[in-house]
């Protein structure tokens, strides 16, 4: 067997590392944010379709469900419990094979069930039957199964269905880690048991100026869990203390923590919701407007604008290459001594095998005292090994070992 020679380029990146830049901005939209709801549903639908295709036909058929829109409803929250006046409308769109050798595949049933199951898990106080309307308008496609199997035999490595690129980097900065871990803690099962009044719509914004960090948290509070303003303020204090614990674990930099800064108690303004998400009150959401595949929005870093959620896990490089870039970057940062920062960009060419990108660009900022010459070979080998086993990404996705937002 002839070994493939892949177009992997490893070079030194000459720029100021993020930790040494004067200003750093980092954002994470929590799982109950309308944009994250759209991402989560799109991905849940794709995974459900993939598993059902595999179960029935032994192969994942073509689909992309990365067009989900969340249209905000209207609610009347009040201490002790309010009500949703107009339900949130969720539109499922995209494409999926619905006709297989003249046999109909239940695309819409699978998609709607996946969306409902995801929402039940992601937004605890949302009444799926009364607070939400889910409409599936996923477009149809048909397929000749024999032809699909024959094509898969001819091309065991899937062919890229687009000319696109993915981007990843490592390691996370202190500010990035704090923002990510703060939201994860506040939306963890453990914290919800301790403080059930905190909804899932949590947005965390980190600003580092020099050596000082400002952490701003917007957290929707569930009105049925707080009887009065005093209860509400006690919940805010719980959020503050939880965030403080995360900060102390990850940095010694002086950090200020702000929670729900739009509150105006004198005028009776508090961030309370019926469901725990601002989608109940007119906030809309779309796939791809939120976190990148590492869970963050990072304007100090290279980023791809591609929406990974909902894209098929077989051949859509908009999903696969973003995840792959992140995994390669993580491994290089962890396994290669002397790497301060690493950035990975992988570009596909439509119709070409996904293990043979047009280029896999690896840019490294070496630590002081290290030369790029000693870092190139191990970085190359890590990237090459991942590309050789790129179809592993598909299994990792379906085994729920990878998140895309």
From Swiss-Prot:
Family named by the database record: Belongs to the AdoMet synthase 2 family.
GO biological process: one-carbon metabolic process; S-adenosylmethionine biosynthetic process
Record's protein name: S-adenosylmethionine synthase
Keyword terms: ATP-binding, Magnesium, Nucleotide-binding, One-carbon metabolism, Transferase
Coiled coil feature spans: none
Reaction catalysis annotation: L-methionine + ATP + H2O = S-adenosyl-L-methionine + phosphate + diphosphate
Function of the protein: Catalyzes the formation of S-adenosylmethionine from methionine and ATP.
Top enzyme class: transferase
Pfam families: AdoMet_Synthase
Classification via NCBIfam families: PRK04439.1-3 (NF003364), PRK04439.1-5 (NF003366)
Biological pathway: Amino-acid biosynthesis; S-adenosyl-L-methionine biosynthesis; S-adenosyl-L-methionine from L-methionine: step 1/1
Residues that coordinate or bind ATP: 139-144
Organism, as annotated: Thermococcus gammatolerans (strain DSM 15229 / JCM 11827 / EJ3)
Molecular function via GO: ATP binding; magnesium ion binding; methionine adenosyltransferase activity
Cofactor: Mg(2+)
